[in-house]
């Protein structure tokens, strides 16, 4: 089996790793960075991903950031020109880019991947992530939870007795807490809890809001109405947040941010760590509820926890580290890089799948309860949250009315007692139930959750044996036809990108050849015959014309012709120079001898120091 890469598809940044030998290794992107911004931009018909997309976000309105926050939303679309893109398609552009530079690094085609998701992602969000992988041309071998992946990275080389580990994962846009038990190569998730709409972006926004308010109070100008100013504020806020992880105060300077009646306006502000902590205190406190719930669901207290692992770039915020230390009663473990741990863990799981890693078993859980709607709009659970997956559970239900010919199976995910308050995953009908009094027919409903957390549901009439099955696609799931269409679009974009790169390479080669040929003609003037230089000059003029006409086919043809003519000229020049040197060699005091090694030919020989006084 070929290499299985591990991808941390993050809200703000993504990372990819692969198992080399027994160790997972981060694959750097073309810029040499170990993480890649999860940013996609559309510019002049070209799709840009990563650093280049993020850099021009200020000037390009067709730039998409934090798309992960919208995974699983059925009606969410990104409109670019006259075309709309789903979150799955935007994510696929990021995955496609990661796939490409991973292939460049490995020197082979990458087909298989393990992709991570926040532990608290529901079925719709997981399915959307898997669909994004398919669109990007990846066979998604496994979807695993981010905290579980970081625990794999932490625990790979640990041979200690059983450890209970709490993973506090605060990323760019999502937050999870998971409790795991590690021992003898078994990584068992005991519980998970979180908030899929809380992360570092929210901390950035607090700084932005503070800057906007202060600027409005001082200058009477509302920067929130200015899109370009907002992008500059966003970048400055993110930088200030990062700075305050290392220093107690930072200066924010944004010259010419706006203009007033008296001329240009500049934003200058000093932000202390104390003020930042004050602005974001409620966000930090908001993470305490999932922290407590994860411990409660695992049946543990903080005293039972052996290690606390911090994961996600936002855990570098000092107030976050301080809070976790206070809540857990112990110093968090800093042995793994919070930006890279998830990708490294995903690569380890990839190694398990490919057979390169032995003696590791990953037992994950479903984050939310699953069940169906029953009479009175009640949500009846079949599988409780934090159940180890894969799993299967069946329960017998019956009809609610006499002679009821069909039952509507409404599949839900959540924790609320009433169906209306929970998340609909899908619904289907079991029809042709024979007439019978209410409560007599026996309908067996079975839930299956696979290793990726994807749900399959079936309903079977025990009397007739008739059965109806569905794989829950959820309201946001894509059909096979839609995925195939999007795969084709992605492939076409890849072909377009290659064509565009080939064109750019050709133009660069033409420019370089014209420059070097003109230089050569100047340098060889008078050294070779006019007839020889005329051929090169004509070929040069032909290429310049093709370049001016922007005719790519002609440019390629004329480039090859000029290359040949220039090469012929270089050969003649070399022969003339060689001949001159040969003649000079024969003009020695002894007249030369064909066997004395001075005949101008290249042959083996010994070199001796010559004494000029002899």
From Swiss-Prot:
Keywords: ATP-binding, Chaperone, Nucleotide-binding, Phosphoprotein, Stress response. Residues 577-597 have a biased composition (Low complexity). Residues 481-505, 605-614 have a biased composition (Basic and acidic residues). Residues 466-505, 541-562, 577-614 are annotated as: Disordered. Pfam families: HSP70 (PF00012). Induction: By stress conditions e.g. heat shock. The modification Phosphothreonine is found at residue 174. One of its GO terms (molecular function) is ATP-dependent protein folding chaperone. NCBIfam families: PRK00290.1, prok_dnaK. Belongs to the heat shock protein 70 family. Acts as a chaperone. This is Chaperone protein DnaK.
């Amino acid at each position: 089996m070929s290499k299985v890469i591990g991808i941390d598809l993050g809200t703000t940044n993504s990372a990819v790793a692969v198992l080399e030998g027994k160790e997972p290794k981060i694959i750097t992107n073309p810029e040499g960075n170990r993480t890649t911004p999860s940013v996609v931009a559309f510019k002049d018909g070209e799709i840009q991903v990563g650093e280049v997309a993020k850099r021009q976000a200020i000037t390009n309105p067709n730039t998409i950031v934090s798309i992960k926050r919208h995974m699983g939303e059925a009606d969410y679309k990104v409109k670019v020109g006259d075309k709309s893109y789903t979150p799955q398609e935007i994510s696929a552009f990021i995955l496609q880019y990661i796939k490409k530079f991973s292939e460049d690094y490995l020197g082979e085609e990458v087909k298989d991947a393990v992709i991570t998701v926040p532990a608290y992602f529901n079925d719709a969000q997981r399915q959307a992530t898997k669909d994004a992988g398919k669109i990007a041309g990846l066979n998604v071998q496994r979807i695993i939870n981010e905290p579980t992946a970081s625990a794999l990275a932490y625990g790979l080389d640990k041979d200690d007795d059983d450890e209970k580990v709490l993973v506090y994962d605060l990323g760019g846009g999502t937050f999870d807490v998971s409790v795991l038990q590690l021992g003898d190569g078994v990584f068992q998730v005991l519980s998970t809890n979180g908030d899929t709409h809380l992360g570092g972006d929210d901390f950035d926004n607090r700084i932005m809001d503070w800057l906007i308010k202060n600027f409005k109070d001082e200058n009477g100008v509302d920067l929130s109405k200015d899109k370009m100013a907002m992008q500059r504020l966003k970048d400055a806020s993110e930088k200030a947040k990062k700075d305050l992880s290392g220093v107690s105060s930072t200066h924010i300077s944004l010259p010419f941010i706006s203009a007033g009646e008296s001329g240009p306006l500049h934003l200058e502000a000093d932000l202390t760590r104390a003020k930042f902590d004050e602005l974001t205190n409620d966000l930090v406190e908001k993470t305490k509820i999932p922290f407590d719930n994860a411990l409660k669901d695992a049946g543990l207290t903080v005293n039972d926890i052996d290690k606390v692992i911090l994961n996600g770039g936002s855990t570098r915020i000092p107030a976050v580290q301080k809070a976790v230390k206070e809540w857990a009663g112990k110093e968090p473990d800093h042995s793994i890089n919070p930006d890279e741990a998830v990708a490294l863990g995903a690569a380890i799981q990839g190694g398990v799948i490919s057979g390169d890693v032995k003696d590791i078993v990953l037992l994950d859980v479903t984050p939310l309860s699953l069940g169906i709607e029953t009479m009175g709009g009640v949500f009846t659970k079949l599988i409780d949250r934090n159940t180890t997956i894969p799993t299967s559970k069946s329960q017998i239900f019956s009809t609610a009315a006499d002679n009821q010919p069909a039952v509507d199976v409404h599949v839900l995910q959540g924790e609320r007692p009433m169906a209306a308050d929970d998340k609909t995953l899908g619904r289907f009908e079991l029809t042709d139930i024979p007439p019978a009094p209410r409560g007599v027919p026996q309908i067996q409903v079975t839930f299956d959750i696979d290793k990726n957390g994807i749900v399959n549901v079936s309903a079977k009439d025990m009397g007739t044996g008739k059965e109806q099955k569905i794989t829950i696609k959820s309201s946001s799931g894509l059909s096979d036809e839609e995925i195939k269409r999007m795969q084709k679009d992605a492939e076409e974009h890849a072909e377009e990108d290659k064509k565009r790169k080939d064109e750019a390479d050709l133009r660069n080669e033409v420019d370089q050849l014209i420059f070097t040929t003109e230089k050569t003609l100047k340098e060889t003037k008078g050294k070779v015959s006019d007839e020889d230089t005329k051929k090169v000059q004509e070929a040069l003029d032909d290429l310049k014309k093709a370049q001016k006409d922007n005719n790519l086919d002609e440019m390629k043809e004329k480039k090859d012709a000029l290359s040949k003519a220039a090469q012929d000229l270089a050969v003649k020049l070399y022969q003339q120079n060689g001949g001159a040197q040969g003649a000079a060699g024969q003009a020695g005091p002894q007249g030369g001898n064909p066997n004395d090694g001075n005949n101008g030919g290249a042959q083996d020989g010994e070199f001796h120091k010559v004494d000029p006084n002899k």
